[in-house]
A protein has these predicted regions:
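Outer-membrane beta-barrel proteins
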Residues: 11-17, 78-84, 96, 130-134, ...
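Hydrophobic, lipid-facing positions within transmembrane beta-strands of outer-membrane proteins
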Residues: 21-27, 90-94, 106, 130, ...
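Residue-level signature of outer-membrane beta-barrel architecture
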Residues: 27-32, 37, 88, 97-99, ...
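Surface-exposed extracellular loop regions of Gram-negative outer-membrane beta-barrel proteins
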Residues: 49-76, 84, 97-143, 154-179, ...
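Membrane-embedded beta-strand positions of outer-membrane beta-barrel proteins
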Residues: 41-43, 94, 108, 144, ...
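Short sequence motifs at beta-strands and strand-loop junctions characteristic
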Residues: 15-21, 33, 49-51, 82-90, ...
């Protein structure tokens, strides 16, 4: 099976155990710099250790040690020798909050973050791969917005810009690569209004553009500038909550997912969907009963 120099085989491909330990040091400072303005600064140092133990023959042979029917005798799957790996990352955030009045705030925040490689991304390898080539994925983001609260309403609106480097993905050959870059920008919102003492209408959503910002060929198509697959522009959740009595609550929810591409080449599209869900909670004397019906119309969707 497979191509001549990338041979799959029947049998066991991997067998390993990994012990992981995570350590973190962090500090946060919240300081008023003016009567109505506060500064929030945080820093976090994190270390993730993997102790990997291979339970099979190391290398690219079959599980019994025999060679595959390829030009050099190697097989598709690569099992590293037992080893230990560590990932250290320093992240920080700085934010500012300004009170316009008793009900309205303005805010802005810059932050960095990371995602260490997952166990399967660094130890379930193919023969072309090396653990040392896989680094942590990095993220930087900036957002600003407004929050307003009153007895009958809640409004939160923010705009954001985010960039990711060293994005970990699998290419068309199912090989983990670590050189991806993506850009994300858009708006997010939460709007809530009490229609009456028992009815509350809420809308939570985001409208954003997610794009690949690096060159990589998938077939003969360069994905640089393409929309990220499985990343819809619009996601929205509209709910109507009814609090009939102190012990009964019900909620009708409409979830909308915009269309999105199914592949990095942007050749195939999922049309999106809108579905309705119903939830209720009833508190009895000693127990709470909850239930929900999802996708009331029975619409065929992809999740």
């Amino acid at each position: 099976l497979g191509i001549a120099n990338n041979v799959r085989f029947q049998g066991k491909h991997y067998d390993f155990e990994v012990d992981s330990n995570q350590y973190a040091l962090y500090a946060n400072l919240n300081q008023k710099i003016q009567t109505d303005t506060a500064l929030d600064v945080g820093v976090r140092l994190e270390k993730l250790d993997y102790d990997y133990s291979n339970k099979m023959i190391s290398g690219t042979t079959r599980d019994d040690g025999s060679a595959c029917n390829s030009t050099d005798g190697s097989c598709r799957y690569f099992r590293p020798d037992s080893r230990s790996d560590s990932f250290r990352n320093l992240n920080y955030q700085i934010g500012i909050l300004h009170n316009l009045n008793e009900t309205t705030n303005l805010f802005a925040r810059f932050a960095t973050a990371y995602r260490a490689p997952q166990i399967n991304e660094i130890y379930r390898l193919q023969k072309e791969q090396s653990i040392d080539d896989i680094k942590s994925q990095n993220l930087s983001s900036f957002e600003f917005g407004i929050k307003r609260y009153s007895e009958s309403s809640q409004v939160e609106i923010s705009a954001f810009v985010m960039n990711k480097d060293n994005v970990i993905i699998k290419d068309t050959n199912n090989i983990v690569v670590n050189d991806g870059q993506t850009d994300h920008k858009g708006i997010e919102w939460l709007l809530s209004y009490k229609l009456s003492s028992r009815l509350t209408l809420t809308n939570v959503g985001s409208f954003a553009k997610h794009t690949y910002s690096y060159s990589r060929l998938y077939g003969d198509i360069d994905i640089n500038g393409n929309a990220i697959d499985t990343a819809p522009k619009l996601i929205s959740n509209l709910s109507l909550k009814y609090e009939g009595t102190k012990s009964l609550t019900s909620e009708l929810e409409i979830v909308h997912l915009d269309k999105y591409f199914l592949d990095p080449q942007n050749l195939h599209i999922y049309p999106g969907h809108s579905i309705a869900n119903l939830r209720f909670t009833k508190e009895l004397k000693n127990i709470k009963v909850s239930g929900q019906i999802t996708n009331l119309s029975g619409t065929l969707i992809s999740e």
